[in-house]
Amino acid sequence: STVYLAWKHGCKPIGTFAHELYATYQGRADVPVAMAQKKVMEDWSTEYDGSLGIALSDNFGFKSFLNDFGLKFAKLFDGCRHDSGDPIRWGEMLIAYYNKIGIDPRTKVGCWSDSLDIDKALAIAKHFNNRIKVSFGIGTYLGATICGTKKKPLSMVMKVVEVNGKPVTKLSDSDGKTMCQNEEYNNYVRQVYDYKSIDDMTVDEIIKILPTFKNVWLTDIYTPMAA
């Protein structure tokens, strides 16, 4: 819908690919499941030739994503998108990753899009100011709120669960956001990608792979107004 609106109004589309792309590639006969994540990034960067350069980072978990991202994709893509797990911990890991591979994180973009409202976005922006370029995708709060009421915003999500007769999955870094209708396949993909949620990783586990990581959580820098 947003691509259509950009075309209709003559605006430049800004964004990234969706979880559905990672899911669809799992169902392709010519793509091994273990290569689905890399293949998506390869094909996307080839198709758009540098445009729309924000990589979605959580379909198989952010830890697994960083294993596949590497120096090549880190240079090709403008930045990465957060959509699950603690947003501050994710940002600290992303900055530490860029530092590790010799890229100045201030030249890259962190794009947050998970359950945002204006106050949370401002808190994230303040925390990462001058450390990485900050961008936000605010959908539900801005696009599905009934104006002039206190009704809870509508949350409408569609994901791919089967392709060519094969189950597919979205793991994510948050409890409750996994999307798969086949438990056996879901467990298989977790093993293939050595999955572990960033929220469940210990500080020592993270520092072992990202030595400059700073252990900060959203709750350390932000308290919701209603709390």
Which stretches of residues belong to each language-model region?
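Gly/Ser/Thr/Ala-enriched C-terminal appendages of enzymes
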Residues: 62, 76, 85-108, 113-227
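Buried, small/hydrophobic-residue-enriched core segments of structured protein domains
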Residues: 1-93, 98, 123, 128, ...
